Amino acid sequence: MAEICCEEAMSPPATATAAVAAAVSASAAAAVSSAIDRRRRRMEMRRIRIASDLELQAGEDGRPGKRQRLARTASGAPRPDEDSASERPSCGRTEEFPRYGVTAVCGRRREMEDAVSIRPDFLPASGKFHFYGVFDGHGCSHVATTCQDRMHEIVAEEHNKGASGEVAPWRDVMEKSFARMDGEVGNRASTRSDDEPACPCEQQTPSRRDHAGSTAVVAVVSPTQVVVANAGDSRAVISRAGVPVALSVDHKPDRPDELERIEAAGGRVIYWDGARVLGVLAMSRAIGDGYLKPYVTSEPEVTVTERTDDDECLILASDGLWDVVTNEMACEVVRACFHNNGPPAPAARPSGVPSSAEAAETENGGAASVKGISKAESSDKACSDAAMLLTKLALARRSADNVSVVVVDLRRGL
C-alpha cells in the first residue's frame, strides 16, 4: 500500500494527462450527443413539414398522403396533373404514357428474323390507343420488318375510314389491315425503289422472293378494351386476377378447323418434323408465303376483350417463348416482377420517342429490331424486368428459336 501511494505521489504528470484525456473524451462525447440531438430535431421538423404538405395536397376523397400523379404533356415534360384546366398549358394535350417492357434476342438461331413494333398513341385523334406488335419471320426477315414498319399505319388508316366520321368495327379493321399488309408484302419487288437495297434472300435467289413470310400478333390497347389480331403461332395472353387468359389461338396445321380448311382448299398437311403445310410450313396462317396460297392465309382471328379492374398484364411473344414456357408460368413471372418492384410510378417516355412514335433508330445484330422505341429502352422497370426474365427463362429451357417478348402493365388505380 505504501509503495502504491508513493508511486502515485511521484508521478503527477501521468495523473494530469489522464485527467486531460478524460476531459477531452467527455467533451467529444458531449459534442457527438449534441450533433445527434440537432440532427434528430432537423429530421423531426422535416417530417412535420412533409406531413403538413401532404395534408394540404389531399384530395376531396379524404385520402391524405397520396402523392399527386404525374402526367406528361405532348412535349414529354412531367408536371402535376391538376384538376384546374386553367392552370394547364394550352399547347399540347395531357397524356399518360403506357407502361411496357420489351426484350428480343436471336437466341440459338444463326439469324434474327423477329421484329417488334411499339407505337404509343398511334391514333392521336381518337384518344389513348397504343399499338403493340410481334412479328416472327421465316425464310427471311424482310416480311417481318415490313410488317414492323407498316402495320400500325395500315391499322390507323383502316380505323379512320368509317363513313361520316364513324369508326369502323375493330374486327373489320384488323381483317382489312392484314389483307393489305399481305398484299404489300407480295408486291414488294415492284414497289421497292432503286435506291433501296435488295433483301439478301432476293440477291441469292430472286425467284424465291415469295418463299418468305411472318407471323403477326397485334394488340391495340385502349382504356376500355384490348383488341388482338393474330395470324400464325405467336401469341397474346392476358393475366386477369392471377388467371392466364389466352387472347389468341396458335394457327397450327393440325388444329382440327385449320386442317379442314387446308384440305378443303386442296392442300395437304404432311408430318415432317411436326405437322406442316405441304410438308414445308409449320403454321397455317401468316403474312406472305405466296407460294403456299391459298392453303396458308393471312386472314387473322380477332378478339375484342373488355378491360376490367382485375387485369394485370398483357404478354405478346413469339413462339420462341411459348414453345418452352406455359401461359401460367409466364403470367406468374410477370406478377412476381410486379410484386418485387412495388406500385408502378408514372411511366417515362423513352428518350427520342415522340408522341406519334413514328421514328426510331433501327439496328441489326443479335437483338431484334424494335420500331417506335429504341430496342434497349422500355417505359417501366417492372415490365422490362419481366420481359428480360421471360427471355432468360426461354433460353434456359433450350428454346431453339428467336425470342421476342413484350409485357404491358394493365393495372389500374395504382
From Swiss-Prot:
GO cellular component: membrane; nucleus
Cofactor(s), names only, from the UniProt record: Mg(2+); Mn(2+)
Bilayer-spanning residue ranges: 15-37
Enzyme Commission number(s) from the entry: 3.1.3.16
UniProt cofactor note: Binds 2 magnesium or manganese ions per subunit.
Keywords, in A-Z order: Hydrolase, Magnesium, Manganese, Membrane, Metal-binding, Protein phosphatase, Transmembrane, Transmembrane helix
Primary localization: membrane
GO molecular function (one): protein serine/threonine phosphatase activity
Domain of life of the source: Eukaryota
Subcellular location: Membrane
Membrane topology summary: Single-pass membrane protein
Domain (PPM-type phosphatase) ranges: 99-410
Residues given in the record as Mn(2+) 2 binding sites: 136, 319, 401
Protein residues bound to Mn(2+) 1: 136-137
Signal peptide annotation: none
Bias kind Low complexity: ranges: 355-369
Pfam families to which the protein is assigned, alphabetical: PP2C (PF00481)
Family classification: Belongs to the PP2C family.
Protein name per Swiss-Prot or TrEMBL: Probable protein phosphatase 2C 9
